[in-house]
Every structure is written in structure tokens, then in C-alpha cells.
Amino acid sequence: MKSLLDKLNLVPLNSGVCTGPDGWLPGSTEPIISTNPTTGEVIAAVSPATPAQTDQVIRAAQTAFHTWRQMPAPRRGLVVRDLGNALRELTEPLGELVTLEMGKIRAEGIGEVQEMIDICDFAVGLSRQLYGLTMHSERPGHRMYEQWHPLGPLGVITAFNFPVAVWSWNAAIAAVCGDTVIWKPSELTPLTAVAVQHIANRVMADYGLSGIFNLAVGDGSVGRTLTEDPRLPLISFTGSVRTGRLVGETVARRLGRTILELGGNNAIIVAPDANLELATRAILFGAVGTAGQRCTSTRRLIVHEDVADHLADRLVNAYRQVPIGDPLAAGTLMGPLVTATAVAAMQRALTQAVAEGGEILTGGQARPDLGPHFVEPAIVRMPTQTPIVREETFAPILYLLTYADWEEAVRLHNGVPQGLSSAIFTDSLQTAEAFLSVAGSDCGIANVNIGTSGAEIGGAFGGEKETGGGRESGSDAWKGYMRRQTNTINWSRELPLAQGLKFGDET
């Protein structure tokens, strides 16, 4: 483990407060202890930001913004290009640290770093495409257009399940847009954030920059400081619905902006004509991958009654063959849950599901023989969409429901408070298009013959209802990090008014 930490410039006690290459601050005297969820062993410690240091970080980001916004966007893109290249050099050690600190399997940890690289590549191209529209003026000798300006220093508050990728979705795009970023990572995964800050600092030093990418590790008090501060025009928050509501309300009181990525109770509909082999593989990846701790994890399976028993048998057989164990070991497909609290939440959900008429088809047992936070992934057949099915439990529980007709399938699919990701498996063009239509899925992401997880960075990521409505990553999500300005230029020698208005001498 020491060799891995050395590659990432990590030591037994690390500062969690930084404003750039020469901006590491000592942090609080009460460190956050990072533990390995696989073994329960201590990895290292991080000193969190004090209130005064959080303010210092905000001031540094604010000062840097005034210079950074003046740099041409394509030049900012070159900086982000070099950040992506620096991440390429350290893909394996950083990915393994993600696995060590969070518990997802090694392939997923490395894949998460690849996601960071991909979004940097996307942002580089975007830096030359921050387009505004040109409009025809109704007045002669006038031109109208719109342009986009950066907002300012932003707060990015991320969750444990994607400890580095979600930061990059925000930071890479915000940076090419001309914003500076303050990162408050999850208390469960502070080391990955410190490692990324070291990598970013190396790139910033090459350009003589500071205050562009900033770090403030800490508990909820650091998050509250960021959300309450009017110097930060935008807060991007990824986490629970409960905390997301508080963030949204707090920022709204000061009329700031938010990007909220909250709960996801994602469903797959399996039509009677579906390719069940393809569906089984997608469901397994969506429900078991990352031990069911993705925002886009498959949590509900809505299957036509004609194929439900057959698909259930296939899934039970597949679940019983899932290799559970050390996420750094070759061949493992499911590692641990992140904390003992998560294990307890899974057990409570299963108990409630049975009380509500559910039948556990397979799994659900804790596996202390493997480590403190290991569980077996569970499939629970439910008689209907009961209260526990409508909740999001961040664990590998898959609820299986059946439907008789299309209207019932859509009603079940949309009948939850969340609206992040969705999918259907069908070989019918008509059924697929119905699912994608306005009368079909009500989610921000809707897929056909592919699961709910594994979104590409080229599309905007986010959802509706209690998912929060925010959009990150690709497409035109960049507009959320900028302010729109409409411009009118009069190049004539007259002063015609809009709508043909006559004012003053002209009667």
C-alpha cells in the first residue's frame, strides 16, 4: 500500500486544504481517518479545513477568477488538456486508490479515472465551441447576438461513490468556461481528492497558475459554508435527496444557482420480445456493479408476466456465480459496501421488503467472513410497488415486479419520486419509441437495449423529480457554468426603437 501512496504523493497525514501548487494549508488538528472498506484498516489521514481556511480558499478562487476569465477559452482548454494527460500517466495508481478507499472493483476504479480523462478531452474540444446565437434584429442597421461569460468561483460537493469522476465532470467543463472551482469531497473518500489535487497542482505549476482548482476537505460544516457564501454563484452537489433539498433551499435563499444530482431509483422494463441473454447481462452489471452504489444502479426490474419466471431463473443463476471479495483481486465482480451503516441499511430494507410481501429469491446475507462490509447481492420478487420499492436503498438490492400491459409497465416505471436513469429491452421499434416518447419514461436518461448504468461523457448527465434536475458532463451542460448575455449593436446613424415605438420628437 505504501508504494501506491508514494506514487500519488500521499503520506500518513495529509493536508486537505489547498489553493494551488504552493497553497497547501495545515488544516485542522482533528484529522479525518480514511479506512479501507474491504478490510477496515486505516489507509491514511487527512487534515480538514478550518472555517478560516475555507474562507481563505474561497478568496483564492475569487482572486484567481479575475485572471482566469481573461485567458482565451482555447488557452484554458490547453491547460485542461494537460490535466488529462497528467491523469493518463497515473491512471492505474489513482484507479487503485479509488478501489482501496471506496471499494469498487479495480476495473471500475481505473474506469473512473478514464472517465476523468475522457471529460478532459471533451472539454478541450468544447473550449473552441462555446457558441452563442446570432439573431436578426427587427430594426434596420442593428445586429443582435448572444454570448456566454463565466460565472465565477464555484463550489463542487461530491459523494463517495464516484469520488473523482464527478469532480472532473464539473471541474473540466467549468475550467474551460472560465470558472474556478472549490472541491469539497466526501468525508469517506478524502485521499482520492488529495491525490487529484496533487496532480492538478503539477499542471498548474507548469502554467504559473494558482487558485483554479482548490480543495477544502471537511464535514458538513464546510459544505454549509460553501452553500451559504454569496461569493459562489453556483453550487454543484451530488448526494442524498435530503441533503440536496437543504443545499437547494440554502442557495436559493441567496438567489444562487445549483446543479443537483440526487437520488436514482432506476428501472429496466423487459418486454415479452426482449433478448433475455442481453437483458440478463445488462441487469447484472447495473444492479451488482459497484455493489449497487451507483446513482444509476438498476434497482427495479419491471418484467412482462410471460417472461418473468424465465428471466428470474436466469438472474438467480447469474447472481449465485458473482465472485465477491477483494476488489483489487483479479476476477472479483463485487467488492464491499462502503460502511457498516450501508450494510445495516440494506438489511433493514430487505426486512421491510419481506414484511411488505416480498420474496427473497437469492442473496441478501451479510458476509463477515469476507470482510466487515461485504454482502450478497439480492433479488426480491415483490407483489407490487410497495413503499420500500419506491425508496432508494444504496445497496445491491434488485426488486422484481411484473406487468400485464404497456400502460401498467409505464405506470410502475414512473411511479417513484426519482427520475434519473431508465431502460427498456425490446426488439420492437414501436415499443422502444413509445418508451422514449413524452408518454414513456419520465427520466433524464432513457436507453433501449442497454442498461441504466455506464453513461458516456458525451451526453448530458442528470435526472428529473427528486433527482434534482441538474445536468453535468457533455452535450450543452456547459451552459450551466456560464451566464448568457444578449447584445444589440446599432451601427446605423438612426435610433429606431423596438416594436416601432415612437418617443419624444417623433410623433
Where are these regions (language model features)?
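Conserved C-terminal structural/oligomerization subdomain of aldehyde/semialdehyde dehydrogenase
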Residues: T39-A44, L209, L232, I269, ...
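Rossmann-like NAD(P) dinucleotide-binding subdomain of oxidoreductase/dehydrogenase enzymes
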Residues: G132-L278, Y403
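ALDH superfamily catalytic-core signature
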Residues: R202, R242-P383, R411, V448, ...
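Residue-level signal for inorganic ion chemistry
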Residues: G40, R76, V98, C120, ...
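Short, well-ordered beta-strand elements within core beta-sheets of diverse protein domains
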Residues: V42-A49, A64-Q70, V156, I268-A271, ...
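N-terminal Rossmann-like NAD(P)+-binding subdomain of aldehyde/semialdehyde dehydrogenases
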Residues: M1-H142
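Structural signal for hydrophobic packing residues in well-ordered secondary-structure cores
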Residues: F65, R69, G84-T91, G95, ...
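Hydrophobic face of alpha-helices
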Residues: I58, G77-G84, G95, V113, ...
